[in-house]
């Protein structure tokens, strides 16, 4: 298989993020990444199987909403156009057939022959009506399937956004809680003092 261009993959990831502009999307991505790295490095959040499963699920939902839904929508549209074309062609053929039979019947003088011709025409008309009804049913089924898929895609997008908001809220709450911890504050202060002393030592 042909390897996917990293630039294309990066653009697809950024497009899947919420936001109206490239700057807002990259800002969300950078903020999320920074918060995640800080939480993991400070042991506020431990990466486990549930985290990996959540990331995989979100990626799968993003892939489905970006690839499968547009493909199915285009396929359903093409199928609907094809069926509508068949219906129009069947109607035109039926009209032409009726006109031809009427012309033929008008030239007949034998009552028996005329009756037989009308009977054959009625059978053909019934068959064409049955075919037209079947095609209409197929169009209705295709439209219903597309409507269901569109609803499912919207629902999955809402679920994904809600889960992202919950995850961000949880991480932020843990970070804020840890920042209010006296031991953590002392640890940060000690690290800052140590860094300053190290810089002064280098200057000497």
Curated annotation (Swiss-Prot):
Keywords: ATP synthesis, CF(0), Hydrogen ion transport, Ion transport, Membrane, Mitochondrion, Mitochondrion inner membrane, Transmembrane, Transmembrane helix, Transport. Its main location: mitochondrion. It comes from the Eukaryota. The chain crosses the membrane at residues 27-47, 52-72. One of its GO terms (molecular function) is proton-transporting ATP synthase activity, rotational mechanism. It is a multi-pass membrane protein. One of its GO terms (cellular component) is mitochondrial inner membrane. InterPro entries: ATP_synth_Bsub_B/MI25 (IPR008688), ATP_synth_F0_suB (IPR013837). It is found in: Mitochondrion inner membrane. F-type ATP synthases have 2 components, the catalytic core F(1) and the membrane-embedded component F(0), linked together by a central stalk and a peripheral stalk. The central stalk, also called rotor shaft, is often seen as part of F(1). The peripheral stalk is seen as part of F(0). F(0) contains the membrane channel next to the rotor. F-type ATP synthases form dimers but each monomer functions independently in ATP generation. Mitochondrial membrane ATP synthase (F(1)F(0) ATP synthase or Complex V) produces ATP from ADP in the presence of a proton gradient across the membrane which is generated by electron transport complexes of the respiratory chain. F-type ATP synthases consist of two structural domains, F(1) - containing the extramembraneous catalytic core, and F(0) - containing the membrane proton channel, linked together by a central stalk and a peripheral stalk. Belongs to the eukaryotic ATPase B chain family. This is ATP synthase subunit 4, mitochondrial.
């Amino acid at each position: 298989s042909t390897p996917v261009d990293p630039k294309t993959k990066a653009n697809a990831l950024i497009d899947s993020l919420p936001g109206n502009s490239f700057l807002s999307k990259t800002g969300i991505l950078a903020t999320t990444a920074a918060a995640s790295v800080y939480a993991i490095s400070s042991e506020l959040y431990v990466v486990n199987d549930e985290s990996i499963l959540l990331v995989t699920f979100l990626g799968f939902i993003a892939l489905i909403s970006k690839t499968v839904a547009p493909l199915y929508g285009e396929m359903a549209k093409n199928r609907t156009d094809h069926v509508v074309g068949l219906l129009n062609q069947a109607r035109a053929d039926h009209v032409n057939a009726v006109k031809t039979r009427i012309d033929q019947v008008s030239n007949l003088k034998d009552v028996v022959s005329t009756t037989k011709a009308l009977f054959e025409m009625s059978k053909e008309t019934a068959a064409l009506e049955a075919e037209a009804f079947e095609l209409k049913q197929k169009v209705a089924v295709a439209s219903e399937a597309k409507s269901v898929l569109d609803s499912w895609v919207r629902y999955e997008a809402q679920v994904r956004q809600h889960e992202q908001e919950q995850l961000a809220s949880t991480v932020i709450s843990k970070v804020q809680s840890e920042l209010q911890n006296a031991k953590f504050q002392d640890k940060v202060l000690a690290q800052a003092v140590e860094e300053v002393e190290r810089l002064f030592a280098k200057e000497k």
